[in-house]
Amino acid sequence: NGAILKITGGEPLVQQKALLKFLEYMEAEWGWIPRIDFETNATIMPDKEWVRVGATFTTSPKMSNNGDPEDRRYKPEVLDWHSINASGFKFVIDKESDLDEVFGKYISPFDIPTGRVWLMPCCGSREEHIEKAPMVAELAKKYRFNFSPRLHLLVWNMALKV
């Protein structure tokens, strides 16, 4: 029927067993399930059942500019799974040198095609977004990545605390 269920917020794969039960309920009650798309930080391996139901994934790996320790935010086996399973990759960029990490820890080691990569400005307000977006958009053009604005900042001028 064309319905898409986008599952995001914090790390949704923490709840993947419960979400699979929810899908079973939907299928039993309605006779169909929507297309599922996750936004994940790529630290938890998706259950193989998600592949069976055709779920798609957008990964947003936390980079060192996030401040979390590397052992909590960088899981090579999970990143490898996402690169093999055609997930999209979204990176929050503060400055051009952040691309050293994007290429060195993600693009090159996992052979991620540039067409599956989105860059977003690292910012906490509408004003900061307006200031940084042109630089990030130019980097996206230069390296043949996609660019995505942070719509919640542009529309509501508020950062999401997830």
What are these regions (language model features)?
Residues 14-162:
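Conserved AdoMet/S-adenosylmethionine-binding subsite of the radical SAM
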